[in-house]
Amino acid sequence: CTPSRAACITGRYAVRSGMYNIGMLRESHGMRGEEVTLAEVLSKVGYATAFHGKWHLGDIEESYPHNQGFDEAFFTGYNQILSLNSKKAELANASIGLHEDLLPEDPYKLDDTFVTKGWVQIAEGTKGGPTRQWGDNSHETYMKSDPEAQRRTLEFIERNAKAGKPFYVANCPNMTSFIPNPKTVSTAPSILQDGLE
């Protein structure tokens, strides 16, 4: 996930950008600011750029999409829903072997608003502007992220097409590309696993 995203956005092998591992919660790691991204190159020649969806290229300010050349960004910084990474979720078999006791100590905060357990599920920002949390860290908010990313993507396309401005937009959904039939019986414990089957 992280390595292929880094390769697509930089045009370089992930090992060269240092993004060769799958990023996990609150690592205080991410793509370095000096990496040249597709968005930066396109911005230099007059394109409007946007990123909406799963970013998964780090949880440090310099790695955020709007700090990597995108004019606007609406993104999740991690892999899937963070609220599953808890002891309670592990006891319910929603996650295996990952809970907050395994995470590094980290004084990380996104802006002047502290959030539950120090991490942010969904953020938004504009080039040169502040990063802000969108919604809360609940499952309900997470389930709204893909429709919101789609809405923003369509609005970005319409706005730039109307202005006659060239644009590049990346929309990377957090969930699988289809929702399984609700009438289908499955042994998978989650909708994500159903989609992957």
Feature map (PLM): residue ranges:
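Formylglycine-dependent sulfatase
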Residues: C1-E197
